[in-house]
Amino acid sequence: MASPALRHFLPRFGAAAAAASFLSLAGCQLGGGDPETVLPASGTFPLKGLAQNVSVRRNNMGMPLIESSTYHDALFTLGYIHAGDRIGQMLGMRLLAQGRLSEMAGADALEVDRLMRSVNLKQNASDLYNAASPRLKRFFDVYARGVNAYLFRYRDKLPADVASSGYKPEYWKPEDSALIFSLLNFSLSVNLQEELSALVLAQKVGADKLAWLLPTYPDEELPFAEADKLKGLNLNNQVNDLSDLNKIALQLSDLNMLGVAASSNWAIAPQRSRSGKSLLASDMQLPAGLNSAWSFVQIRAPKYQVSGVSIAGLPLVLSGFNGKLAWSMSNVKGDNQDLFLEKIKREGNRISYMADGKWVPAASHQETFLVKGGSPIRETVYETRHGALLNASATPPGNGLSLALQVPNFKDDKSLDAFFDLSRAPNVEKAFDTSREIRAITLNMIFADASNIGWQVTGRFPNRREGQGLLPSPGWDGKYDWDGFADSMLHPYDQDPRQGWLAAANQRTIPKGYGMQLSNSWGYPERAERIAELANSGKQDLRSTVAMQYDQTTTFAAKLKTMFQAPGMSKPLKQAIDALPEADRNKAREAFTRLMAFDGKLSATSADAALYELFLQESAKQIFLDELGPETSPAWQALVANASSSYSPQADHLLGRDDSPYWDDVKTPQKEDKPAILARSLAAAVTSGDSLLGSDHKAWQWGKLHRDNWTSTSPLAKQLGGGEFNRGASPAGGDHSTLNVSGFEWGKGFDTHVAPGLRMIVDFSLVEPMTGLISTGQSGNPASPYYANSIEPWQKGQYMSIPLQQQNYEKGYGKQRLTLTPGK
């Protein structure tokens, strides 16, 4: 994404009333689809279920402002508007979470459904909903009735992704909203995919060399003791369905529009701000494409006012501003999913598993799959003491090893109530009180009021008797079992630190050796390092905060130069370059010279940024491909997948690990070392650039390699092929390590894989403190004028002010409104 033209950064009270009827027609022409499927922007319409009239206005982004005389009517209207804007997203996520996507998509989705039935988010959602207060259940019920009012009124005018599938949606239930929350929680915990990938890597290289592929953080020791758990096990032949399970988990990640565990948020204390008032910033990241699962909403009702971030299907504001308190969330990268290897004995359809020296019958229950175009399929799901056995096929697991997934249970969990209470909190102190009750999801919550800032880690973290949770543990040995959960009083927090700021960017947020285990799946440290650089550089304001959110400078480039110049590397690397054949020698020298002069700015138009990223990509191949390849192999795909979710061996080897066995190219008779492989990588970067960008190296541009592809992320649209839901591609800057995140798959390709979907800033010095923008559009319906209208403002950094004071509504939302009246 391009850096913003900062002269356009100032919040604009755009005239939202600009010809909505024309925009509806334009949306139809530009986006495809039937305008009759789009909610009207004006007029008066009766809606059965309302008690009094409700007004809905929209700003230029398409963000709705719901004004009502009762909170009941506000929730009902929110359900109606969410469905009108995002019904395809809501239905797709519900089917995915239920393990019923094949009812819409056919047999191609059956394997994902089978995995999701084993994961059993339905039980998690049931526990959460049952534990909620009667008040919260009423809220969810009213919201569901609003969704259903839309489904009834538009039953013959559903958007293209739903209508073309032939799927007939069921009405929304209150429990379905808890299911969407459970899917979000499941998606933010990346350990299932990481542990599957780690096991695939173990199959390829064995337990002895595995730890080198599982670094946890730059200053942490490699997990050799963790890898020792797998020694003596015949992983190649005994683990049931491992290759298929890993493939299905990757497919699930691709389908799940919530399935990226990345985000950034920070707060600036009054002593660090130019105005003497606090600031809060939030970058919420998701799979790149159309549309971001996040969307904006504003509600004004008696005794309740809030603007912020929502997910269609869930009547909660997850990050936002209520006039007194701003709050935001990012992924703490918490590890609360563990796989266990279970010894399995099968006798007919009966399954037993080994537990502390005894064979124990596995519990079981039946699941029925109603596959589109086929007959119903009944299968058995088996469970051990750790959880359900993950099965990739219709037949019960055979003798050998199978994988069971253990996750926390949510009985007596008050997280749903806590999120609602947080949206009403008047200050940071009250925000701490309510957020400590959020146990069902692992988050970095950052808060600010005008005078204070705070950070609180939420979630439920298992106490492991042994092991780090990086790899599946032997389930037959109780020494690896969970022993309850960490006391929430041990969860990290901070308030008004002396440094004057707080930040979370998926990095390790606790000191090495902290007293409880939050995770060993931390993200890369560079984004947090860059926040620290900028936050410490002087007084902050809205302008500097916008610049931070669009910053494309990586701190990794400077680390790379330090490595090149290290006393033990400088001379050997020069010798290794000199030893290359002449053509490669010249390329390597050019690459080295340019990288040493590179300033780390990854702008889309930069030639040196292109070379830098080519080097990162080629170095991964030069280091690992000889042992993990080819690039289509499960092991290589596992390496790439893990690098997209947490700190990677690709980065770890470049900055250190000089004694790693992977520096040797096993396909040559001689033994290579790190300088030799780095020299090859430098030359290969130029060779690859010549092939991809041409021989004029000064004309190279990072954005010609690295592009934002505006393709649909909706599970329904993906299953239908995408076509009319897509909007082409555009050059992008940045990468996984920049604050303006634009991560690609390290070892696979250059296209953007993860990017921010929504940005929010609250500057308490302003009359209207909240500004924001969304990356694509508020609506998931390609016939809507708000489907992709935000792409250009997003690329230019053109934030919109989001007014909370009633006298400013007309400036922000215009005069045009949709009026919903009580129907009969």
Curated annotation (Swiss-Prot):
Assembly and binders: Heterodimer of an alpha subunit and a beta subunit processed from the same precursor.
Signal as UniProt keyword: yes
Catalytic reactions on record: an N-acyl-L-homoserine lactone + H2O = L-homoserine lactone + a carboxylate
Family: Belongs to the peptidase S45 family.
Record-listed E.C. numbers: 3.5.1.97
Signal peptide: 1-26
Annotated Gene3D superfamilies: 1.10.1400.10, 2.30.120.10, Glutamine Phosphoribosylpyrophosphate, subunit 1, domain 1, Penicillin Amidohydrolase, domain 1
Major localization listed first in the record, in broad terms: periplasm
Compartments where located: Periplasm
Biological role stated in the UniProt entry: Catalyzes the deacylation of acyl-homoserine lactone (AHL or acyl-HSL), releasing homoserine lactone (HSL) and the corresponding fatty acid. Possesses a specificity for the degradation of long-chain acyl-HSLs (side chains of seven or more carbons in length).
One Gene Ontology cellular component: periplasmic space
Keywords for this protein: Hydrolase, Periplasm, Quorum sensing, Signal, Zymogen
PANTHER family documented for this protein: ACYL-HOMOSERINE LACTONE ACYLASE QUIP, PEPTIDASE S45 PENICILLIN AMIDASE
GO biological process: antibiotic biosynthetic process; quorum sensing
Name under which the protein is recorded: Acyl-homoserine lactone acylase QuiP
UniProt GO MF annotations: hydrolase activity, acting on carbon-nitrogen (but not peptide) bonds, in linear amides
Keyword Ribosomal protein: no
Enzyme kind, highest EC tier: hydrolase
Further remark: AHL-mediated signaling mediates quorum sensing in many species of Proteobacteria, regulating hundreds of genes, including many that code for extracellular virulence factors.
Pfam families referenced in this protein's UniProt entry, alphabetically: Penicil_amidase
InterPro entries the UniProt entry points to: Ntn_hydrolases_N, Pen/GL7ACA/AHL_acylase, Penicillin_amidase_A-knob, Penicillin_amidase_dom1, Penicillin_amidase_N_B-knob, S45
Active site as annotated: 264 (nucleophile)
